[in-house]
């Protein structure tokens, strides 16, 4: 499972012009599920997302986690993040989980996040989404389980 996290001052996801998820300060995370992923993969990614130290402390060092600052978590499914881009000029999606597995594990991740963190929002799995964000930094990390 991959999570491309971006520290944001705010972010929102729209589907057909309707806002379906938004957060203020926090993390926007694009999530890709791969064929061998399990609920344990999702739990490991969630632990990292909530505890990865990407927010600045009083001295300006990245020493604070999402949990420490009480920021929002916006999860957006993005199967293209799992693409194989090693050869050719067209990405292959054979390294992405089938849609049924992807949706099941994304929903599991979202459910667990809502149990463990205060402010959690999401996009809509499989939908054509427009993602709006104000990057903070920018600070971006690719986390893999």
Curated annotation (Swiss-Prot):
Keyword annotations from UniProtKB, A to Z: Cytoplasm, Hydrolase, RNA-binding, tRNA-binding
EC number, UniProt record: 3.1.1.96
Keyword tRNA-binding found: yes
Pfam families per the UniProt record, alphabetical: Tyr_Deacylase
One Gene Ontology biological process: D-amino acid catabolic process
Any one Gene Ontology cellular component term annotated for this protein: cytoplasm
Sequence motif: Gly-cisPro motif, important for rejection of L-amino acids, positions: 137-138
Entry annotated with the keyword Coiled coil: no
Recorded domain comment: A Gly-cisPro motif from one monomer fits into the active site of the other monomer to allow specific chiral rejection of L-amino acids.
Record function comment: An aminoacyl-tRNA editing enzyme that deacylates mischarged D-aminoacyl-tRNAs. Also deacylates mischarged glycyl-tRNA(Ala), protecting cells against glycine mischarging by AlaRS. Acts via tRNA-based rather than protein-based catalysis; rejects L-amino acids rather than detecting D-amino acids in the active site. By recycling D-aminoacyl-tRNA to D-amino acids and free tRNA molecules, this enzyme counteracts the toxicity associated with the formation of D-aminoacyl-tRNA entities in vivo and helps enforce protein L-homochirality.
Family: Belongs to the DTD family.
Oligomer status and interactors: Homodimer.
Alphabetical list of HAMAP family matching this protein: Deacylase_Dtd (MF_00518)
Protein name: D-aminoacyl-tRNA deacylase
Source organism: Pseudomonas fluorescens (strain Pf0-1)
GN (gene name): dtd
